[in-house]
A protein has these predicted regions:
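Post-HEXXH active-site segment of zinc metalloproteases
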Residues: 263-264, 275-299
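An active-site-proximal "capping" alpha-helix that borders the catalytic cofactor pocket
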Residues: 269, 293-306, 406-407
Length: 476
């Protein structure tokens, strides 16, 4: 087959697709075994499916009293509202209500996660991979060194977290920071409201460093009638960018005029522009980009937006708000997702060594990690040891690291463009146009980013540190 492909020029454009297909051969089983694996598909999904039923349907949290004295029913959706409350009592009550409920089912959650880990080992051993980690990285042809390097580099810079949490304590006026204080707002939210037209103009202004071609195409997309802007009866919540190969991207928004809505526009249009250029410059079979690359373009736009708003803020308070947005992106994406990635690595290592993944083992492993990542500046309350039980991504193993590498690459792209590094803008446009025409690391190498061996992750951590210093100065 390979010889036939070589001799047939009409098939040349399918080179990568065939190469990617043929390299799977060593992990394909004889027919009877493949049939068995196919029949086991539903069995392999039992842990994840049961987790979702338990977490979404059966798990109930005790009611809490909100800031106005009203009794409210806590759930996974509104927890994020109350854990960010300005009222510390509300934050603590929400934290304890949530994790006490997980504590009641910790043995069940442990059994489900253990089942998922065992499934990973069964599949990876059966298909002759060296480990579940290498099996998960194989599809994107990711070097295991990147996964380990990410964890190592973030670990080497955890003093940033220590500084950030110490500053949090000072700004909030606390004697000590607990886990229920970690999401408390450090600065007052801005009161500005935006019309959709104003929001579009702000996003366009913020993204001007991406050049005339990008901006002109962005304006065309805004004017294309492909964006469903406002909330409406029976409309689903959230936001996303979607479409197919021979159409413009379609974007769903639920715009309400807040800055977070403006940020959502920048984020989703980042995905849309990535799709627009990939569909334009790649054949259909190479036009879809993998998850490893998907969050880069959207995060680039968010960083540019926060940077522009920070530079053009009218007050110190407003500038502090945008800087804090960026800090929280670093903390929750670069650091937190790396902590999750390290937890996954640790529990698979424990399983391989024959350790039984009981609730106690999982809780102790997670609590030790939490203490390491937050340092002495935060009290790692005992209940936080149960956080692993509520993370659905752990049932799609070795996935979350992609969020951390995504923000790291985005930081490098933004820095290079702002520093007017030779070829930086052209390289970014080339990246947006590459789709899935090669493996993710190869696509990045072609545009000057060797994330496995260069300083991409270090630069992101440096940007985190610099943003923290700037935030310190303005909040003195």
């Amino acid at each position: 087959i390979k010889e036939y492909i070589k001799e047939n020029n009409n098939l040349k454009k399918y080179d990568f697709m065939f190469y990617d297909l043929f390299r799977e051969k060593e992990h394909i089983l004889p027919l009877r075994e493949e049939e068995m694996m196919a029949r086991l598909g539903e069995v392999f999904s039992v842990s994840e499916n049961t987790f979702r039923i338990l977490d979404d349907v059966n798990l109930k949290f005790s009611n809490i009293t909100d800031e106005e004295g009203n009794r409210v029913e806590l759930n996974n959706s509104n927890y994020s509202v109350y854990i960010k409350s300005k009222n510390r009592r509300v934050r603590k009550d929400a934290f304890e209500s949530l994790y006490n409920s997980y504590n009641n089912f910790k043995n069940t959650f442990a059994s489900l996660l253990k089942g998922n880990v065992k499934t990973n080992f069964f599949i990876s051993n059966t298909r002759k991979y060296n480990s579940p980690l290498e099996m998960s990285l194989y599809d994107d042809n990711i070097d295991k060194k990147l996964y380990l390097s990410l964890i190592e580099k973030v670990n080497d810079n955890l003093d940033i977290m220590e500084e950030y949490m110490t500053l949090r304590k000072d700004i909030l006026g606390l004697d000590e920071v607990h886990m229920y204080d970690v999401y408390a707002p450090l600065v007052k939210g801005i009161d500005k409201t935006y019309s959709y037209e104003d929001a579009k103009e702000l996003v366009i202004k913020a993204l001007e460093p991406l050049g005339e071609v990008y901006i002109n195409d962005l304006k065309k997309l805004f004017d294309s009638n492909c964006i469903d802007v406002y909330n409406n009866e029976n409309k689903r919540g959230g936001a996303y960018s979607w479409g197919c190969y021979d159409t413009l991207p379609y974007v769903l928004l639920n715009f309400e005029g807040k800055f977070t809505d403006v940020s959502t526009i920048a984020h989703e249009l980042g995905h849309s522009m990535h799709s627009l250029y990939s569909h334009k410059y790649q054949d259909y079979h190479d036009s879809g980009y993998p998850i490893f690359l998907a969050e880069i373009a959207s995060t680039v736009n968010e960083i540019f937006l926060n940077r522009y708003c920070s530079l053009n803020a009218e007050t110190k308070e407003e500038k502090a708000y945008y800087l804090n947005n960026l800090l929280e992106n670093f903390r929750t994406t670069l650091v937190r997702q790396t902590m999750f990635a390290e937890f996954e690595l640790l529990i698979h290592d424990l399983e391989e060594k024959g350790e039984v993944l009981t609730d106690e083992v999982l809780c102790n492993t997670y609590l030790d990690l939490n203490k390491k990542y937050f340092g002495d500046s935060v009290i790692s309350d005992d209940l936080i040891k149960l956080e692993w039980a509520r993370i659905p991504h752990f049932y799609t193993s070795f996935y979350v690291y992609k969020y951390a590498t995504g923000i790291a690459v985005a930081c490098k792209i933004v820095s290079d463009i702002l520093d007017k590094k030779e070829g930086a803008l052209d390289n970014y446009m080339k990246f947006l146009s590459s789709g899935g025409s090669d493996f993710p690391l190869e696509i990045l190498k072609k545009v000057g980013i060797d994330i496995v061996n260069d300083d991409t992750i270090d630069k992101a951590l440096e940007m985190f540190r610099e943003t923290l210093e700037e935030f310190k100065e303005i909040t003195k």
